[in-house]
Regions:
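Extreme N-terminal starter segment of soluble prokaryotic enzymes
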Residues: 2-4
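Short linear functional motifs in flexible/disordered or boundary regions
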Residues: 28, 50-51, 88, 107-110, ...
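Conserved glycine-rich acetyl-CoA-binding loop
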Residues: 57, 78-96, 103-105, 116-123, ...
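C-terminal "cap" of GNAT-fold acetyltransferases
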Residues: 9, 108-151
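Acetyl-CoA-dependent GNAT
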Residues: 6-77, 82-83, 95-97, 101, ...
C-alpha cells in the first residue's frame, strides 16, 4: 500500500479534526481544542495539519502551530497513527513533511511536549534529532519537553 502525506486544506478541517479527535481519545488528552480553536490554531500561516492517507482513508496526522511569544519557533502537536497502520514509517513521513514546511516557513526551532507515559514518543523524537529542554508551556499533562534546531 502506498501512503500519501499532505498538508490539509481549509476544506479538510473536518477530516483533520476527526483524526485529531481519535488522538485525543487514544492519548487521554485533557486539554483539547474545540473545532473553532483547532481551525484557528492549525489552519493559519505558519501552521498546518498533515494527514497520512492509505487507499482514501485518513490513517494518521501531525500538527504544527506557531509557538506564541517566541520568534522563529513552531510547536509540533497531535502526532498520531492508527494502531493497525503503525510500524510502516507513516509517523516518519508525517514529521518529515512538517519539518520541510517549517524550514521553508523560516522556523529556526521546533518544540514539543509529551506525557510521562509516552516514552515511545520521546524515543521517536530523539531519533529525529530532538533534545530534552526546559518546560516551555503550562500543559498540565506534559512532563517531557523537547526542542530541535532546524537547518
Amino acid at each position: 500500500m502506498s501512503t500519501k502525506v499532505y498538508r490539509a486544506e481549509n476544506a479538510e478541517i473536518a477530516a483533520a479534526y476527526g483524526i485529531v479527535s481519535e488522538y485525543y481519545e487514544a492519548a487521554a488528552v485533557v486539554v483539547r481544542e474545540d473545532l473553532d480553536r483547532f481551525s484557528k490554531d492549525y489552519f493559519a500561516d505558519g501552521a498546518g495539519v498533515w494527514l497520512a492517507e492509505e487507499d482514501g482513508e485518513v490513517v494518521g496526522c501531525v500538527a504544527l502551530r506557531k509557538l506564541s511569544g517566541s520568534e522563529g519557533c513552531g510547536e509540533i502537536k497531535r502526532l498520531y497513527v492508527r494502531s493497525k497502520f503503525r510500524g510502516r514509517g507513516i509517523a516518519d513521513q508525517l514529521v518529515l513533511a512538517l519539518e520541510e514546511y517549517a524550514v521553508a516557513f523560516g522556523y529556526k526551532w521546533l518544540y514539543l511536549d509529551t506525557a510521562a507515559d509516552m516514552k515511545a514518543a520521546a524515543r521517536f523524537y530523539e531519533k529525529k534529532g530532538f533534545e530534552r529542554c526546559e518546560r516551555y508551556n503550562e500543559n498540565p499533562q506534559a512532563v517531557i519537553f523537547m526542542r530541535k534546531t532546524l537547518r
